[in-house]
Amino acid sequence: MGRSLAAIALALVTSARTPSTTSELSFPRDHGAHPDAPVEWWYWTGHLSDRAGNAYGFQVTFFRVRELYLAHFAWTDVSRKDFRSEEKMHLGLPGVASAASEKLDVSNEDWTARQSPAGAHLLAANGRAGELRLTLSPVKPPVLHGERGVSRKGPGAKESSRYVSITRLAATGTFVRSGKSQPLTGTAWFDHEWGSGVLPADAAGWDWFALQLDDGSELMLYRMRRADGSATPFSSGTFVPPLPGVALPLKWSDVAFTETRAWRSPRSKARYPAGWKITVASVGLDVGIEPLVADQELETPGSTGVTYWEGACAVKGTRARRPVAGRAYVELTGYAGRDVPGMAELSARARSVSPWAGSATSRSAGLRP
């Protein structure tokens, strides 16, 4: 699902129109924008390393809520236990913030995501942590989650979205910090989701997992949580086998899920899960997941207004009774409350900066230089 509950929750205050969930998806066309959907987002996360073996994680997300464009960029320096995040918000105007239909071409000021003629995703974002530029080349074809790409969040027709992932991309690029350019390589994950943005009334938040295992397989899981912590019946997932083939849809009943530890934010005071054990017997998977850095919490007062945890994690366990390791990104929303601003407030906030532009702010957590 890739994308932040922040974006979905923003649409709760809009008059939700239901986009088509019957049209056949075609790529690269459907990597572009879908103007009939009130809410849409493009999301990349990944695990990178430099020539010295230092590990990093990144998140770059572009949101479109009707004609309001928001974006988040987060950078995790694992060895320094340093996490930094940035945000942007602008009204959609050429040269300021936009998303093209028919192809991947999304921008929010100088943060951009475009598709090359060869099919690679060209990603650029920057902030106080530094400047990231990546070329992400798909290793596997797009995966359609749910029923032919229709991901249902509840029983109603409006409680659904179109949800597509590329679960493994080869990453090359650079990170420029303090004038020094570091070559990077690694792997990335891409999510694209669009729809009405309506969630069931009993959904308090969600936990989302994107696992990339060293045997070449991937697993996406999301647990939509009620206030009492139980999963709604529309929690689900997808297992992608090592070789290109048919992805296996999963029901939440296929998953054994346990939280193993917790972490409390010193800023928001939210208590987040900080370790998990996940078993999917039908695919022979039994793994533990732990954050690489405890504090990977994003506060977004200048854009979506939602505080959430999204971070790089390590995976270790077994698949088909053989040892397996890997990497993951995990997103945790709703633990710091569901304090979502209305669209009128967001639009006023954007217009208050200039007639066309919104705000761009940043924060850092962990070790500060």
Q: Model-predicted segments: where are they?
A:
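Bacterial Sec-dependent signal peptides at the C-terminal "C-region" and cleavage site
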Residues: 3, 7-22
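Structured soluble/peripheral alpha/beta segments that form catalytic or ligand/cofactor-binding pockets
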Residues: 17-363, 367
